[in-house]
Amino acid sequence: MKVTLIAILTCAAVLALHTTAAEELEAESQLMEVGMPDTELAAVDEERLFECSVSCEIEKEGNKDCKKKKCKGGWECKFNMCVKV
């Protein structure tokens, strides 16, 4: 009987801690949406670089010149890379 009670109380404590941690993560993710930290900005920069270079490689077939992809938010495609203008 004592073992069952201890197991139930332990599970309840773990569940409470897990719920609290999940709420904290959700709050942090909402804060990140408002102001992006440097690591998230770096990921966005890498995405822009990848999108631009892939776009240029796909468009550059035969002797056709690569049409520069218009990168948004102050970025420009140069030499198959998005660079900050």
UniProtKB/Swiss-Prot annotation:
An annotated Gene Ontology molecular function: toxin activity
Signal peptide, first to last residue: 1-22
One Pfam family per UniProt: Toxin_20
Keyword presence, Zinc: no
Disulfide bonds: C52-C66, C56-C77, C71-C82
Function summary: Postsynaptic neurotoxin.
Protein name as catalogued: U4-theraphotoxin-Hhn1w
Species name: Cyriopagopus hainanus
Lineage per the UniProt record: Eukaryota, Metazoa, Ecdysozoa, Arthropoda, Chelicerata
